[in-house]
């Protein structure tokens, strides 16, 4: 039996996860994408196929504070807080967390914990 690469394992988990995780207007989906250098998160209404709000480490608001954010848990928690604040301003308190096939550990967990601390419920 051949071993799948880490990227293929992540894609396989993501496809399996997306069958059950669907966001709507009352409870949209908080989707997370993690690359080697950056982390991206967005709140999506799947029924209308619209992105309600988003945040990432390449966000203009975060770039003004420092030129380059490191790819670590601290920058992920900053993104989580920023996303939660933007979602609450738009009137969203509850979301469904979509980890995007990534393991719930490290940068993904830091983003989720920071979003919870900032007021999002999931």
Curated annotation (Swiss-Prot):
Cite a single GO BP annotation.
Answer: translation
* Record Pfam families: Ribosomal_L18p
Basic residues biased stretches = 1-19
What highest taxon heads this organism's lineage? Bacteria
Ranges for region Disordered: 1-21
Provide GO CC annotations from the record: cytosolic large ribosomal subunit
Has the keyword RNA-binding been applied to this entry? yes
- Does the record carry Ribonucleoprotein as a key word? yes
Q: What GO molecular function terms would the record report?
A: 5S rRNA binding; structural constituent of ribosome
Q: Where would one find the signal peptide in this protein?
A: none
Q: What SUPFAM superfamilies does the entry give?
A: Translational machinery components (SSF53137)
Keywords assigned: Ribonucleoprotein, Ribosomal protein, RNA-binding, rRNA-binding
The entry describes its oligomerization and partners as:
Part of the 50S ribosomal subunit; part of the 5S rRNA/L5/L18/L25 subcomplex. Contacts the 5S and 23S rRNAs.
The record's annotation in PANTHER family points to: 39S RIBOSOMAL PROTEIN L18, MITOCHONDRIAL (PTHR12899), LARGE RIBOSOMAL SUBUNIT PROTEIN UL18M (PTHR12899:SF3)
Record's family?
Belongs to the universal ribosomal protein uL18 family.
Q: What does this protein do?
A: This is one of the proteins that bind and probably mediate the attachment of the 5S RNA into the large ribosomal subunit, where it forms part of the central protuberance.
Identification of the protein by name = Large ribosomal subunit protein uL18
Name of the encoding gene: rplR
């Amino acid at each position: 039996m051949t071993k799948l690469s880490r990227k293929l394992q992540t894609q396989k988990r993501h496809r399996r996860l997306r069958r059950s995780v669907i966001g709507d207007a009352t409870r949209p989906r908080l989707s997370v994408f993690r690359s080697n250098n950056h982390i991206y998160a967005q709140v999506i209404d799947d029924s209308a196929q619209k992105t309600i709000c988003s945040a990432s480490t390449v966000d203009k608001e975060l770039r003004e504070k420092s030129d380059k954010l490191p790819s670590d848990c601290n920058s992920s928690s900053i993104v989580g807080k920023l996303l939660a604040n933007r979602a609450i301003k738009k009137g969203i308190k509850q979301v469904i967390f979509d980890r995007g096939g990534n393991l719930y550990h490290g940068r993904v967990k830091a983003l989720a914990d920071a979003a919870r601390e900032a007021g999002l419920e999931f």
